[in-house]
Amino acid sequence: MEIKIVRNVLEANNKLAAEIRQRTANSKTLLVNLMSSPGSGKTTLLEKLIPMLQAKGYQIGVIEGDITTTMDAERLQPLNIPIVQINTEPFGGDCHLGAELVLPALDSLDLANLDFVFIENVGNLVCPAEFDTGADVNVVVLSVTEGGDKPLKYPLMFRVCHLALISKTDLLPYLDLNLDLLRQNMLQINPKLTIFPISAQRGDGLADLRDWLIKLKR
């Protein structure tokens, strides 16, 4: 019975995810799901990346996921973009956003006038990988401070993602991290994974990321 319940939950989520994909396909909106551990730099990345997309004429929306607080959404307010906050605490404090939460959030956005919508998922390397949000692109952000073994310890996250961002590369001179080995570990789990080293603080790699997303949008 327990296995059946789990299967039913995932099946229900997948049906809603398919509905989300149909909706964003109709509006020609690229839905991007950002996943990572807490503190990997997702919000800082959005603070720097969104203006770069806006400078190219693209309209952006954000769905902010956290267990509690609106702190990350408040950081993005100066960008003058539509932001929908989802706090999971009222729903049991889930450590992920599922399609059942993303779908009503999309109802609050004018998708017809948005080119990109970024989901900033709840900080966790486990749960978010298990639930399809309906995103067109899954992105994992892994900071250099987390070590090179994370792809091997949390393989599902890297298996379900299309893109891996190795963040905070400006800290590499202060760390004992083998960047080539980290790449190898990522590709061992997912040989099709695209990998960009980035530093949101310095701007390194952000132009490549912007262009990669724009190419997908076209």
Give the label of every model feature segment:
Residues 36:
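The Walker A (P-loop) glycine that initiates the GxxxxGKT/S ATP-binding motif of P-loop NTPases
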Residues 171-218:
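Canonical P-loop GTPase G-domain recognition
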Residues 59-60, 137, 162, 194:
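Residues at the starts of beta-strands that form the adenosine-phosphate
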Residues 3-22, 26-32, 40, 49-135, ...:
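Nucleotide-state-sensitive switch-loop elements of NTP-binding domains
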Residues 66, 167, 199:
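Active-site glycine-centered loops adjacent to acidic/histidine catalytic or metal-binding residues
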Residues 43:
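Walker A/P-loop
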Residues 119-182:
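Phosphate/Mg2+-binding loops and adjacent switch elements
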